[in-house]
């Protein structure tokens, strides 16, 4: 009778521990959903972007400083609007709307956090 641990059993256990550790570490590094920024519901939007069928329509809009864009979610899938700089972030929605007022000139790129191929741009240009 032998009381030693076999090499195979030792390696199997080590690989299992390493795999479980890697899974925990990677889960801790996952970006998760961005924190929503409240909608500017009290502001009248001058442009509406429809969010449907894995696209923003229109994908590019131009407004003046102080104006707002409203994203109208019309299903059937869940989407959000997340600015590259996180200056505006909607919740994940199937239906409903999200409005953001832009005060500074610039180009604001955004995408859907769960469908990153969905991309759009808001250009804020002084008249």
Segments predicted by a language model, with ranges:
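Extracytoplasmic copper-binding redox domains, predominantly the cupredoxin/blue-copper superfamily
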Residues: 2-127
């Amino acid at each position: 009778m032998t009381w030693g641990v076999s090499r195979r059993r030792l390696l199997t256990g080590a690989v299992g521990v390493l795999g479980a550790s890697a899974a925990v570490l990677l889960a801790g590094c996952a970006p998760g959903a961005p924190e929503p920024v409240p909608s500017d519901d009290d502001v009248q939007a001058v442009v509406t972007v429809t969010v449907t069928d894995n696209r923003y329509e229109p994908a590019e809009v131009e407004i003046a400083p102080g104006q707002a864009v409203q994203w109208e979610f019309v299903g059937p899938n869940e989407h959000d609007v997340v600015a590259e700089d996180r200056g505006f972030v909607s919740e994940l929605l199937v239906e409903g709307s999200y409005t953001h007022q832009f005060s500074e000139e610039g180009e604001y790129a955004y995408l859907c956090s769960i469908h990153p191929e969905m991309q759009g741009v808001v250009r804020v240009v002084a008249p």
